[in-house]
Amino acid sequence: MIIYPAIDIRGGRCVRLTEGRFDAETVFADDPAEMALKWAACGAEYLHLVDLDGALAGEGKNIPVIKRILEAVSIPVQLGGGIRNMQAIEKLLELGVTRLILGSAAVKNPQLVDEACKNFPGHIAVGIDAKNGEVAIEGWGKGSGVAATELAKQMAQYGVDKIIYTDISRDGMLTGVNVEATAEIARAGGIEVIASGGVASIQDIKNLLPYQKDGVTGCIIGKAIYTGAVDLCEALALAKEG
């Protein structure tokens, strides 16, 4: 299982939100590239970046910071937040991002996902952010009326490389990963899923490991590695063993 340390960028700084709320922000570092180096030094194999300003604005807002991170580390990086057209996809892949995560676009513009997967196979993931099984869109601001499992099936047909599944009600709350819902998405789509939202302790990693057989192949850890609730080095070692 791959552990993805999360670096959420807002206003050029590394922050964490609680339940995706922009009015509930904690700043953890002024330089996200330093954070990236720290996690890479721990042995991280892959980084998860989110352009929070981009998610809200619908276009990339922290490109200089993202560029600095890509120059600082040699490990692959996946990025989400405000990627809503082919021009942005091409630009970010050229910049050196390995995997791009399409969010709201998957619901509002599925043709974009289809086209991106055809043009850049293996580089496109879809973020399914859900509350009570319903997909949320536009920086989690509103519900879509679409069931998360149905969206997973549709995305699998397009040839999406991975799904990043976030249970919004648990994100940044340190209440534990919604393991069952994550595994259900993997089974529904027959596609690899990365768990996100709510990692509170090393136990969450242990709870996810048995679901690798269902297709849960990764886990994003955010707030817990910043507060010290999870030791990233320990989590990485555990995931490697599993």
Regions from the PLM with identified roles:
Residues L112-N119, L209-C219, I225-G242:
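C-terminal helical cap(s) of enzyme catalytic domains, especially alpha/beta-barrels
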Residues D8, W39, L47, L92, ...:
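Conserved, mostly hydrophobic/aromatic
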Residues G60-K67, P110, G141-E150, T175-E184:
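Charged helix-capping and loop-helix junction motifs
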Residues I2-A6, Y46, S74-Q78, R99-I101, ...:
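Structural preference for beta-strand elements that scaffold enzyme active sites
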Residues G12-V15, E19-D23, V97-D171:
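Conserved anion-binding
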Residues Y46-P64, S104, Y165-T175:
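Glycine-rich, proline-tolerant flexible connector loops at the mouths of alpha/beta enzymes
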Residues D53, K61-K118:
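Glycine/small-residue-rich loop that forms an oxyanion/phosphate-binding "nest" at active or ligand-binding sites
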Residues V73, V77-R99, E180-G215, A235:
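Catalytic cores of alpha/beta
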